[in-house]
Each structure stands twice: as structure tokens, then as C-alpha cells.
Regions:
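Entry/capping segment at the start of metal-dependent catalytic domains
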Residues: 1-40
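Interfaces that engage single-stranded nucleic acids at replication/repair/recombination sites
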Residues: 221
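Metal-dependent phosphoesterase core characteristic of DEDDh/y 3'-5' exonuclease domains
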Residues: 24-66, 87-212, 217
């Protein structure tokens, strides 16, 4: 599964519980692709969230271009979207891949919390193309390479429609399979990164404590 989120802003702190709602931004667009191991796309999902319990920061809208009017008109209820994501996580038990996966895992973790749902992603392996491609960094002032820069390096063309979650999820998938093909990603490297993600998932589990227990979602696939 290749996943990307566009959000209402950035976290103020990374080590506080999701119950501190004003600390954690809200997802405004959530997209993911399900692919086979050889890169064949099985399905894609793309949703905007229209709940009125938050507003995006002007700086965030400037980046992703998702206005309040647009998401209210085009979006779905948060719980509906998170239920669809949870169903796919449970059905496919995928490797979850993102570019800056830590942020995406926190974003879906916070919105699972807001929806009163358990977070199936915490029980699944994950991989971050940003963490795996530090050797592609050309700017000595940068620690990681941005998705658009990685894409243009690998494919010698500009990534179009950046900061649209579906476009970025597809670009992450393209980069992952290209990196797999050229040997920059191997099964061993994916396995080694799981140890690095243990701390991230522990923080997410800690942040998500206190999920309301009276709300029970039955997901049948």
C-alpha cells in the first residue's frame, strides 16, 4: 500500500497524545494505492474529508490548494473514509509505504483516534522511501530528499501535480518500484527498516491511548 496525506497544517509537537486535538493537524485528503509485489496496481482510493471541526491553516492551503469550500463540497465524513482505509488494511495486510511515512502514520493515527477506531496500521510493516534514499541528497544542508526531487532524479522528468495526495502516492509507488529494480531497495533493507519504525509506532500507540471504548466498528471484508 502506497499512502499519502494532505493535512490542515503540521504537528506542533510529536510526543503528545492525540487527545490534545489542537496539537495534531487533520487530514484534508487521504489517498492510497494497493499494488502487487511486481508493481501491478490492484486498486486506488482518493478521498477528501469534509468534517467542520477544523480549518486548514492558510500556509497549508497555499501548499496543497485544498480550500475549505472545496473539501466541504467534495469530501466525505472522516469516519467513513477511515473505515474504508481500515477495511483495506485488514483485507490486504500490506507493507505500508510512504515518503515521510512517520508523518503519514501519525496523520492516520490521529484521525483513527478522532473516529473512535483502532488503528490497524500499527500491526503492519511499513517502509519510508525518504529514509531509504539519503544517498540521493545533493544539497549538503538537507538530510533527506524530497519526493519531487527523488522522482525527477529517477525518471528525468518533473513530478506533476505535487501535493495532491493521489499524485504523490502514485509517485511514491513509481519511485519504490524503480528503486527496487535498481537495487537501492532490497528485501533486506525493508526488513532492517522495520527496527527503525518500532520507535515511531511506539510513539503512535502512546499518542493514541484512551481511544473511546464505547464505539465499536465491525469491519467485514
Amino acid at each position: 500500500m502506497f499512502i499519502d496525506t494532505e493535512a490542515s497544517g503540521l504537528p506542533k509537537k510529536w510526543n503528545v497524545p492525540y487527545s490534545q486535538d489542537d496539537n495534531w493537524p487533520h487530514i484534508v485528503q487521504l489517498s492510497w494505492l494497493i499494488c502487487t509485489k511486481d508493481g501491478k496496481e490492484v486498486k486506488r482510493q482518493d478521498y477528501y474529508i469534509n468534517n467542520n471541526d477544523f480549518k486548514s491553516a492558510a500556509s497549508a492551503i497555499q501548499i496543497h490548494g485544498i480550500t475549505e469550500e472545496f473539501r466541504q463540497r467534495r469530501g466525505k465524513d472522516r469516519s467513513t473514509v477511515m473505515s474504508i482505509l481500515a477495511a483495506d488494511l485488514l483485507q490486504y495486510s500490506p507493507l505500508i509505504v510512504g515518503h515521510f511515512t512517520e508523518l503519514d502514520l501519525h496523520m492516520i493515527g490521529a484521525d483513527f483516534y478522532r473516529s473512535g477506531m483502532e488503528n490497524p496500521a500499527l500491526e503492519l510493516p511499513s517502509f519510508c522511501t525518504m529514509m531509504a534514499t539519503t544517498h540521493y541528497v545533493r544539497n549538503p544542508q538537507m538530510k533527506y530528499v524530497r519526493l519531487g526531487e527523488l522522482y525527477s532524479t529517477l525518471f528525468h522528468r518533473k513530478l506533476e501535480n505535487q501535493h495532491n495526495a493521489l499524485a504523490d502516492a502514485k509517485a511514491t509507488a513509481d519511485c519504490f518500484f524503480e528503486l527496487l529494480k535498481n537495487g537501492d531497495i532490497t528485501d533486506a533493507k525493508i526488513e532492517r527498516q522495520q527496527a527503525e519504525m518500532v520507535k515511531v509506532k511506539a510513539e503512535i500507540k502512546s499518542a493514541g491511548y484512551g481511544i473511546p471504548v464505547l464505539i465499536v466498528f465491525l469491519l467485514t471484508v
